[in-house]
Every structure is written in structure tokens, then in C-alpha cells.
Amino acid sequence: MITVSVLTAFKIYMKGLSIFLQKRYFGVALPFIINSLMLSTWLLYTPYILEKLQITESQLGYAFFSMAVGAVTSLSFSSKLIKKYGEGRYTFFSTIGYITLIIGAVLSIELYQLCIILFITGAFAGSMDVGMNGLAALIEKKDRQRFMSACHGFWSLGFFIGASLGSLMMYYITFPFVHMFLLACIALILHLVFFGSLRLEKSEAAIEVKSGTHSLQNKTLLGFAVIGLLVMMTEGAVMDWCTLYMSEEIKAPDLWIGYGLAMFSLFMAVGRFIMDPLSDTYGSKVVIQASLVIVVLGIILVLAGGLLTALFGFSLMGFGVAGIVPEIYRLSSRIEGVNPSDGVATVAGTGYLGFLIGPIIMGYVAESYGYPKIFMLIIVFVAIAFVSARFTFNDNYQQKLISTEKDSRLV
């Protein structure tokens, strides 16, 4: 029985990956890899930046904040530009801009220069985020395939490769700019080779929206935005506080302190690669609600105490959050009466907002009430997200989506 289950899981896993052997689909996934690969490599040089600029960690935090503000700012115009030029061209050029500009971060000699460069880089990163998710949703719709979650899995994979391989390369390449420049050249060449005709991809026609209305006035999109906000706050909370929780509450040995985050990241990547076939089989509603339940089970294990129990809990949390955001990206581009680019931009914007306010809220909770209360608060977030999902996936919404897509599996 166990052997059959393992073989079944392996078949599902390979089904989610095999599509990317085709140039067209790998070209769609490549911007996700480039985005995280360049980001994780740049993050390796934050100690170098601190020493070079003679700034404190809090000052570096301002620089990171400027990057986030740049990303959020870009969301205000991304949708309009995508409608004009198309998802393909927008993704193509925003990726080139991102690759080029992030190199400049290691060349900064003053804090204000770093903040300006990261603000502009963040704007391109935000543009890239909306573009590549919109493009993936468009190709999914045109080709009647599911691979959005796997694209986000490639983002996780790119982050892992950048951090691990980048750490090794730092021993052989002593100049940060040379390292970043070589990586940028490789990324740019791959992008030019594999993106190809995807530059021409564009939604067939814009959806007419009454003037004076805002995307969030659509209750379905608002529901997805709330889910995205809360889930991305959850992701950020684990990434920010997992290591400290392992150290201060679990009292893990130094060797094991980082393994909570490692297990969370690993199972998030694995989950994203396997989630598309599961979504295709059971539907988005089941996947999202089941994933939220898995997150809660993971939190319960994390709070139970004990090193191995906590590691298993973080693994479940990573697997649980893996497919939720990709699913709402996909669904937000298919809402009747909402332009696909508006839907994706709205979900991306609320997600970035979660990353902005999440650390502030969690920092206050940790300082005032202790680290365990962070995870108790996450349970509240997940519960609200679950209720939002219940109301969002109502019969009226499902019928609209089915009539639009002619495919009941999408719900």
C-alpha cells in the first residue's frame, strides 16, 4: 500500500514538471527563476553592503523598505501598461530592467544611493511580478493547462539555487559586482533565448468596466485579495520569526536553529510543484481550503514544543501555504467583469501590503507577548482566510467561472 502511494505521488509530481520540458512553458517559468535567483544572490551581499556603506541593520532596513515601496508603487501603473502592450512584452522588458538594475545595488557608496537604486529595482520587480503572473495565467487559459503553482515552485527553486550556489561562488569570485554581473549576463541570455515568441502574448480584448469603479468593488476579487493578504502575511511571519522561535522557544542547538526555515522553504517548493495536478483533479476550492487546514495543523505542532515536532510542523506549514497564492493569482485573472491584469495586480498589491505590515504587527506581538503568540495570531489569520474562501467560492461565483471557462475543473 505504501509503495502504491509513493508511486502515485511520484506520478503526480512528474506530471507537474514534465510540461516544462517544452520551450514555451519553460519560457513562462524562467522569469520566476530569474526573479528569485538575482534577489537571493544580492541578499548574500548584505553584510558586504553594511561594511562598505558603514550603516546599521536598521538603516539597511530602510533600504529594504524602499524596495518594497517601489514594488507597491509599480502596481498602480502595471495594469494599464499591460492592457496597452500585453502581458508578453511587459514581462519581457520588466525582466530585463530588473536584471540590469539589481546589479547597481552592490555599486552604491552612500545609503541614499542604495535606497534610490532599490526603489527603482523594486518598481521593476513589482512590474515583473504582475507581468509574469499575468502571462502565466494567460497561457494557462489559452492552452488549457495548469502550471501556475509550479511557476511559483520555480521561484522557490531559484531562491535556493541562488543562495546555495551563490555562497559557493563567493569563495571564488572576490568582487561582488563581478559575481552579480556574470549572473546577470547568464540570466539575460537565457531570458532572450527562451522567452521568444512569448513577447507577442496579449489578452485578446479588454473587459469593459464601468467608469468610476475600482477592482476591489468586485466581491469575488475582494475575497481573493483578503486571502492573499493573510496568507502572504503568514509566509512573511514564518520567514521573519521562525529562526528566533527555534532558538528562544524550542531551545534548539545552534546546528538546528536554521532547519525550521529550511524545512518550511523545502516543503513549500515541493508543494508548489505538486499542487497543479492536485488542483486539476480536485479543484481550486478544495485545494485552498485543505491547504489552510494543513497550515493550522502545522501551527499546532509548532506550538506543541519539541525539536522534531516543530520541524514537522514547519514542514506542514510550508506545504500548506505552497499552493494558495498561485491559485488566487490564477483565479483573479478569470473573474467575470474584471480585467485579468487588474485582477492579478490587485492580488499582488494586497500581497505586498501583507509583507509591509506583517513584520510590524508580528514584531509588536513578539515583543509584548512572546514568540508563541505570533503563531497563535497566524491561526486567526488562517481562520479568516478560510471563512473568506467559503464566501468567495459560492455557487454564483462558480457558475460565472464555469460559463467563462467552459471547464468545471477550474473551481
What kind of feature is each model-predicted range?
Residues 73-109:
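Conserved MFS/SLC helix-loop-helix module at the cytosolic interface between two early adjacent transmembrane helices
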Residues 42-43, 219-262:
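Extracytoplasmic gate region of multi-pass secondary transporters
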Residues 74-86, 170, 271-283, 366-367:
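Helix-to-loop junctions at the C-terminal end of transmembrane segments
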Residues 119-153:
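Cytoplasmic helix-loop-helix junction between adjacent transmembrane helices
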Residues 282-328:
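C-terminal transmembrane helical hairpin of 12-TM major facilitator-type secondary transporters
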Residues 54, 86, 107-112, 251, ...:
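Helix-breaking motifs and short loop linkers at transmembrane-helix boundaries and internal kinks
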Residues 178-196, 375-391:
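Symmetry-related core transmembrane helices of the 12-TM Major Facilitator Superfamily/SLC fold
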Residues 21-45, 119-120, 218-234, 315-319:
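Pair of pore-lining "gating" transmembrane helices in MFS-fold secondary transporters
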